[in-house]
Structure formats: C-alpha cells, structure tokens
Amino acid sequence: MGRILYKYLDIDGAKCMIGNHNLQFTNASQLNDPFDCHPKLLDYSDVPKHKLQGWIPEEWWIEKEENDALNLRNDTWLCSLSKVNDSILMWAHYCYNHNGVCIGLDIDNVMESVPPMFGEIYLQPFVLDVQYKSIIERPDGYCNTIGLFNYQWQTKAKEWEYEQEVRLVIPRPSAMYAALTPAQAKHPKETWDWREIHHYMQLKGECFESIYFGVNIDEQEKDKIIQFVRKKLNPHINFYQMRVDADAFRLQPEVVKPLNSDLSHG
C-alpha cells in the first residue's frame, strides 16, 4: 500500500466523486485563500543586469514577470488533499458540520490512473506538500527553476497548518477533461469564466482505500454509499465511522463491520 491522503467532502460532493470515480481539480485563482499561488509570493524587483543591457527598461521586466506569474496561477488547476483524516476543523468546514465524508486515496494508485495527456505541458500532476510560513519570504523570481514554481504553488500562511495539505498540481490541463459541476449544469445558458470550470481525472477502484463517515452523517446516506462502493467501486475498501472521544477533544475512527447482505456481494 502506498501513501494514503484524504479528501474531505460534503455528502453531495462525496457521492459525485464516488459515483463518477474521479478527482476534481480547481483553478488556483478560485481557492478560498486570496494568497494562494499569488504572484506577489515572488520578488521580481531585482532585475538581472543582463536583461537591462538593451533598450527595455527595468519597469517593463518587472511587469512582464509579474504578469507571467499571474498567468501561471490562472493556468494552473489543483486538487487539495490532507495527510490527516481526523481534523475537527476540517470536518466542520469541508464536511458541513461533520455531516459529510472523508475519502482515503492511495496516491501511488492515483498516479497510475492519470489518463493520457491529462496535462498539455506535464503528463502527470505534481504531488506537493504545502509549506506553511509565518512571513512572505518572496524569493528571487528570476531563478528560473521548477522549484520556484513549486514555491508559488505550495506556500501558504501558518494559519492553515492544521490542514496538513498535500496538493496535486497540473498546469494547463487538457480541455478534454473539463466539465461543469452539477450545480453549473443546472444553468446551461450561463456563461462561465474559464477559471470557474473544473477538470476531472478518472480513478480506478483501487485508488479508493478507505471512507470515513462524519459524526453527524445521515444513516440512510451512509448505507447507500456503503452498498454502492462494495458492489460497484471497490469491494475491499475500508469503512470507518468517526466518533467523539469522551476523554479528549479528538475524533476516533470505528470500523464499520459489514452486514451479511454486504458479504454476499464480496
């Protein structure tokens, strides 16, 4: 088994992900943190001397490089995962007051599921552990390395550290993997900004390693998910019910034992 990372979702998002066997990527400009992947994370003020030997002024170079960084942000889609499945805050924020689901994904299997030409520049997403900073360090933006791009993609404020985020990052994903969300599809005449369009990567059943149900999960929804997953997605998946620990401010997973009707489909 490879590294397991977790996706926190409300019940509708979980059913979409499980039912469609896919992973949703969101444009970097559309995230809930305005600092995310922002061009100002990098410093373009110290223009290298060799760029100033011609007639082009320093201000032009600074504006150009900042625009390039902005375009990189607008051309990048990512999927946010977590190293942990028991964050009380994430269960509250992303699973609508612990009513949702946390899905464990085997990242080795996920990377093996990447479809052909998912990205126009890179064939596979980058897997980046988010780095949390107390200050904006603003490294030199003229160091033309992939590490510099990674800094823009993976740097967040210290306040977000509880999320223990790992990102799958794909610059310029192929348009063939773009699709409207169910909510967007309800408004077929609406004109959407291209950055509002999500991209979806199909997953094999073995990518789904575990499913954790929130403390306040609706029991009927829970049963529907278990039956669907065991019959049509991955019969070997592990199910857990999150419980409140009576002795500490933490959540404890409890194994969901299969019913006899479940075993008959194994």
Task: List where the protein language model places each region.
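Partner-binding and oligomerization surfaces adjacent to conserved cores of proteins
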Residues: 1-266
